[in-house]
């Protein structure tokens, strides 16, 4: 099929696919700013940094989101936020002592920047949702006009409810076959890293449904919520799987909505993309995200600049046949979330909490939205180690919670099965979950994991009845080895009897 007539939008200017493929001169307009990239064939040297102001605007937006959630979602101090959350940024603005930023403790908002070269960026906390980033032309006064989502918490008090539905944990000895010293050594392995760029906030180990190890860094406790980053994708997949199980969505039917811009002749091959394609990160659509999401393109516009997450996700060119190429892209997840919204209608806003979070006791979890009320389930979920432990336990229990089946065995098989387009690349990715890499012989092959930026991992090891949760605030390029942590924890189970 010829995909050349499909077009892509970044910002508001339409870019023809032929220009993308031939690497010709492309002009992108995003949030009113311009990039002029010279033709590759011309080999001209640019002397002006066209990205400078976009980068600065988006970085200010990042800092606004990090500070707002750090202060009001995680309930951390300004000193902690600058020392850890903002270590992710190349050049944070100001210090804990002050700078070109304002914190409005009464309205729970943050304003970043001086407004001289680029607009000030603002983020505001909303109860039950977390912080929302506003576009440059909105202020904290506009927050009241945003779509209202009423997400009440359940009546049960977690502190008085026994684990795993609540946080009341009874002291119990380790099983006789578990080596406590080896478990402590694994914990030290997680917390005492050689690289200062690897910062472990919490470690939780569940065995046969019980908490057998729990440890937190100074200034963090079991109630501390931090961003899951792409571990949110696994939560999104779970919610979507529930709808597939109910027959409200289908893995192999077209997504069922229009892409942007709409095809003039009505013949748009993008409408052939299925839910399986996007959950397998194999949509065939143009990849626009970039490392760090620091530019004013792709999902970075939604995360840090106030753009619509659904408009951006639907505004990409089809450059490959769907299902034939794997390319990690936040927008693919957001297309799946948009399909979920279309299937749910008026039930959309309540669905994550009603169908999953409240069911399994994830009461400390917030699912954030963009300013239009669309869940950004590719990254913006805030939670703690215990709630992610519950999430992993749901999968360890084959989708059953309190004798109620929430997700089918078929869906669990899907998320653990290699995406077809990854088979020649090691088969590490499934349906928004990650698999053990080929050639890695130090961990069981049945293990699988969520994975989020800055070291957010929930590892499920069915053969050992284990869930391992590691939360981090890593920065830099030295990624934390979740499979190495799994190996170290398993050293404590060498005497575990075979089932």
PLM segments and residue spans:
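Active-site SXXK
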Residues: 209, 227-252, 278, 336-340, ...
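Short, charged, amphipathic alpha-helices and their helix-cap/turn boundaries
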Residues: 181-183, 187-189, 210-215, 249, ...
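Bacterial N-terminal signal peptides
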Residues: 29-37
